[in-house]
Design a protein with these regions (language model features):
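Non-catalytic, solvent-exposed segments at the cell envelope interface
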Residues: 1-514
Length: 514
């Protein structure tokens, strides 16, 4: 049975809300287009100050819970996670003309496109994870930064696209972090008209369908996309139609639409890299004006300089190292929910493991070589606090785990090991945390004594000394047995490589023509 938050409408998730300010709610996945346009552009136009005034800003995270930032790699680099949010809001006539039901004008917006861009710490690869708009999730409590209105956490599960109406894009960010455990650094949004203008400026993006398509039903519903079988270069409003098409592709679901969006984005990246016409300063200035005028970002990306710095990071990734995926899911009535494979995909992103599998050996080597330069103190001089983190949503904390493991450490010569009796925590995997570089060697020595992998030794400002958190993966025994982890991308994520120029969307037989 579908679960929804009280006071929401199960079918559409719409409700009343104050009229949104101009350009506040922006939409569709072509936000990525704005970033990538800047990524291939020259530097000359980037310093015009007036471009900064084009960029709208909003708060990054409206929830109470924060996710810790990832630990830097050996080179001091950290991954970068950007949430792309697209809204169905039609808050001005220009966007209303581009399609959609007239009755939705000015109503509470829904986040109908949600994609997480993960740029690896070493900037060698880029992963994209799409979440279907009708995914059932728990939306956390969020506070609107404009008027202070507090939106209570959902009672049960609600469709993820409703999160945008709970104070703004920062609530969608909070919802993603609650579900995935992934620290999100930034968000970006773009409007309908921005998609059209920027796609026009590029000059066309090639896409493929395996049959003639007209995505419009007998009642006039649908994007209106009409293409002949084969490859067509689309731009402007036709590009927007492609990004919005649902009925005409595959099974007519939002999952098919996400797949088509991935194909478009991959093709767009290839086109941007190959299109010599973008070397024209006039074209680049036009693109800069359109890109900065179309996007809304958090304050961390709120200037052209910051966007340019981001674009320089993104442009380091070659198309063959870009992987597009969709969150593995299963149907619950007309909605979907994450599967076990979804958590596996989220873990790969959290641990900065490339979804194309090409750096698996490198990751293993780095973990093996991660020994600290800081020598460990003598065992009997190392203070260790052991915490019980075995509690999960399904299981109570395993009784006495902190004292049992602390006792084992004392037997091994760590005389200053003590258990934390203040209460149980919830940690999926066992971790050894340390606050500063001078204790890194001590933390690694403790981990080695118990068989805990070096990848589970983390620097954290939340602790004041070496702290061992016994996780849910170690509910019994005194020697840690690291679970064997499969670091391959789940097949159910339907991965699409950025260099694949042979991909072709399957047309729903009910929407073809001759």
């Amino acid at each position: 049975m579908q679960e929804v938050a009280p006071g929401t409408e199960a079918e559409s998730g719409r409700g009343s809300r104050r009229a949104p300010r101009k350009h506040r709610m922006l939409r569709w996945s072509a936000t990525t287009l704005a970033v990538l346009i800047l990524a291939v552009a020259g530097t000359g136009y980037l310093y015009y100050r007036h471009l900064n005034s084009n960029i709208e800003q909003d708060d990054l995270n409206l929830g109470d819970n924060k996710v810790a930032e990832p630990t830097p790699n050996a080179a001091g680099q950290t991954p970068l996670n950007i949430l792309i949010i697209g809204s169905d809001a039609r808050d001005n006539e220009e966007n209303q003309k581009l399609g959609g039901a007239k009755e939705t004008f000015g109503s509470t917006p829904l986040a109908d496109v949600q994609m997480l861009l993960h740029l690896s710490a070493d900037r060698s690869n880029l992963s994209v994870v799409s979440m279907p708009r009708d995914t059932l999730v728990k939306i956390p409590k969020c506070t609107d930064p404009d008027d202070g209105k507090v939106y209570a956490a959902s009672n049960g599960r609600a469709m993820t696209n409703q999160s945008l109406g709970h104070g703004g894009p920062g609530c969608t960010v909070a919802t993603w972090q609650e579900l995935t455990g992934i620290h999100i650094d930034h968000f970006m949004m773009v409007d309908f008209s921005g998609v059209v203008s920027m796609a026009d400026a590029i000059g066309g993006v090639p896409v493929c369908v395996d049959a003639n398509i007209h995505s419009r039903d007998s009642e006039g519903h649908g994007s209106g996309l009409k293409l002949k079988k084969g490859t067509t270069s689309i731009k402007g409003e036709q590009a927007l139609q492609w990004l919005r098409t649902r009925y005409g592709f595959e099974d007519g679901s939002d999952l098919a639409r996400a797949k088509a969006q991935h194909m478009y984005m991959n093709s767009m990246v290839r086109e941007l890299r190959a299109n010599a016409t973008l070397s024209s300063p006039n074209k680049l200035r036009k693109l800069a004006e359109q890109a900065t005028g179309a996007i809304t970002v958090d304050s961390g990306l709120g200037t052209v300089k910051k966007l340019y710095d981001l674009s320089n990071e993104l442009r380091k990734v070659e198309p063959e190292r870009i992987t597009m995926t969709t969150m593995p899911n299963r149907y619950v009535g007309a909605r979907v929910e994450p599967t076990e494979d979804a958590e596996k995909l989220f873990r790969l992103v959290r641990e900065d493991i490339a979804l194309d599998g090409k750096d698996a050996k490198k990751a293993i080597a780095e973990k093996a070589e991660a020994a600290s330069d800081d020598p460990a103190a003598e065992k009997d001089e190392i203070g260790i606090l052991v915490q019980n983190g075995t509690r999960t949503d399904a299981l109570a904390a395993a009784s006495g785990r902190a004292s049992t493991v602390a006792g084992q450490l004392v037997e091994e010569g760590y005389d200053k090991a003590v258990s934390d009796r203040t209460g149980s925590l919830s940690e999926a995997t066992t971790l050894v945390r340390y606050p500063s570089a001078e204790l890194e060697g001590d933390a690694q020595a403790v981990a080695k004594s118990l068989g805990i992998p070096m990848s589970s030794v983390k620097k954290s400002t939340d602790v004041s000394g070496v702290t061992l958190v016994v996780g849910a993966d170690w509910r019994e025994g005194t020697t840690y047995k690291a679970p064997k982890q499969d670091d391959t991308t789940p097949k159910t994520a339907e991965a699409l490589n950025g260099a694949d120029d042979t991909a072709c969307m399957h047309v729903n037989p009910g929407f073809t023509w001759s």
